[in-house]
């Protein structure tokens, strides 16, 4: 019997890098409400007392970036100098420019379906049947822990009123013969008000954050718990660390369980294949696993700037496939249009649906409807996390001729 440990981590919406991601995606969403054809590449940096918005945006929309940035910061919970950062009083510096016309000529086409990729690059999508979300268990649990921290923190009459926005979680799982069998270690660090005793903090975090989330079937006497192991975490958020858009790409994806092409997501409109193609191959891999064609599936796709058709598509199922990997690849090519325009149409991506994905993972989330009013005053209902649907599973299984 082979036995090994595997670890993944997540960070809360108050982590400085995630603050930056949420601002970048809030800018993208605000622009898409007014201008679906906008080209957006928005980067954010946050540090003590300041948020810097930079990047390249080509749009007919007008957005009050300063007010929007402040709102995101305050909504996260940085609303007072007492916590070290206040969205109402921090400086906001706007360094936005326009997208290069050299890129535009490679992306824009007379026929929409001929739209070229916004850049070269390689992207990976992954799915596994070890959780109901088709995500690796360690990253799934880590996300739920920091999500629970925020839920408890934001409750009116919270039982843990001393919680602050910045937090991190980490889960180490033991695998036996490739199957998750136990939680070996749990790490959770949460920012807090001064004055809370370590003993009281540890007990409260165990009861209100860990206990409701951790699967009891995987806990055992030997499970190690490290709760605020430094003993003090008062200084956090953008005061403790500089935050940058796109610096949590493993947290955003599969927690290290799958490969990563290197491109970040937040602040990028769907013409950027770093984002849209990564969503598409997650959609592909998840439907392959949901169809029962494999227990695990990783799909790689690559592009050349200005070229519509993918340069390559490859599939690996790590020996868990019920049919050969090359046959799964052929099924993918038959049922999924992985050209940039095809992806945008297939997943209905030109809507303001992105800010919710900027914290707690872009994958493994339940699709949900979001309503907004467009620039014509029309009410529009869009689907966030559309790439998490498994609506292709049935046809894939039928075409694979599995019983």
From Swiss-Prot:
One GO cellular component term: cytoplasm
Pathway: Amino-acid biosynthesis; S-adenosyl-L-methionine biosynthesis; S-adenosyl-L-methionine from L-methionine: step 1/1
Gene Ontology molecular function, alphabetical: ATP binding; magnesium ion binding; methionine adenosyltransferase activity
Cofactor(s) listed: Mg(2+); K(+)
Sequence positions that bind K(+): 43
Record-linked SUPFAM superfamilies: S-adenosylmethionine synthetase
Cell compartment(s), UniProt: Cytoplasm
Residues where Mg(2+) binds: 17
Database matches in PANTHER family: S-ADENOSYLMETHIONINE SYNTHETASE (PTHR11964)
Subunit structure: Homotetramer; dimer of dimers.
Job of this protein: Catalyzes the formation of S-adenosylmethionine (AdoMet) from methionine and ATP. The overall synthetic reaction is composed of two sequential steps, AdoMet formation and the subsequent tripolyphosphate hydrolysis which occurs prior to release of AdoMet from the enzyme.
NCBIfam families cross-referenced by the UniProt entry: metK (TIGR01034)
Name of the protein in question: S-adenosylmethionine synthase
Organism of provenance: Xylella fastidiosa (strain Temecula1 / ATCC 700964)
């Amino acid at each position: 019997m082979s036995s090994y440990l595997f670890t993944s981590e997540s960070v809360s919406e108050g982590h400085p890098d995630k603050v930056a991601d949420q601002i970048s995606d809030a800018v993208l969403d605000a622009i898409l409400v007014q201008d679906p054809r906008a080209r957006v590449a928005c980067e954010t940096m946050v540090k003590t007392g300041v948020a810097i918005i930079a990047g390249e945006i080509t749009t007919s929309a007008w957005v009050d970036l300063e007010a929007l940035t402040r709102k995101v910061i305050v909504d996260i919970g940085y609303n007072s100098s007492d916590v070290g950062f206040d969205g109402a009083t921090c400086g906001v510096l706007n360094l936005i420019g326009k997208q290069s016309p050299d890129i535009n000529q490679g992306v824009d086409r007379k026929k929409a379906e001929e739209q070229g990729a916004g850049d070269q690059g390689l992207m990976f999508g992954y799915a596994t049947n070890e959780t109901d979300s088709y995500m690796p268990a360690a990253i799934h649990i880590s996300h739920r822990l920091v999500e629970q921290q925020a839920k408890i923190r934001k409750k009116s009459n919270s039982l843990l009123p001393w919680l602050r926005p910045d937090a991190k979680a980490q889960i180490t799982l033991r695998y036996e013969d490739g199957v998750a069998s136990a939680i070996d270690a749990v790490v959770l660090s949460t920012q807090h008000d001064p004055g809370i005793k370590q003993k009281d903090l540890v007990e409260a975090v165990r009861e209100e954050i860990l206990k409701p989330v951790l699967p009891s079937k995987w806990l055992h006497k030997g499970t190690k718990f490290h709760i605020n192991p430094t003993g003090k975490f008062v200084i956090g958020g953008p005061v403790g660390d500089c935050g940058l858009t796109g610096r949590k790409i493993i947290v955003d994806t599969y927690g290290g369980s799958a490969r990563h092409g290197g491109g970040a997501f937040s602040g990028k409109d769907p013409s950027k294949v770093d984002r849209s193609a990564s969503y598409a191959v997650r959609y592909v891999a998840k439907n392959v696993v949901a169809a029962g064609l494999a227990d695990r599936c990783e799909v790689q796709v690559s592009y050349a700037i200005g070229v519509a058709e993918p340069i390559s598509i490859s599939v690996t199922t790590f020996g868990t496939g019920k049919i050969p990997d090359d046959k799964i690849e052929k099924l993918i090519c038959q049922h999924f249009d992985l050209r940039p325009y095809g992806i945008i149409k297939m997943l209905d991506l030109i809507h303001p649906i992105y800010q919710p994905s900027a914290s707690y993972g872009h994958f493994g989330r339940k699709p949900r409807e979001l309503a907004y009013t467009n620039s014509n005053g029309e009410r529009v209902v869009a689907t966030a996390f559309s790439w998490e649907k498994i609506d292709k599973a049935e046809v894939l299984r039928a075409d694979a001729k599995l019983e």
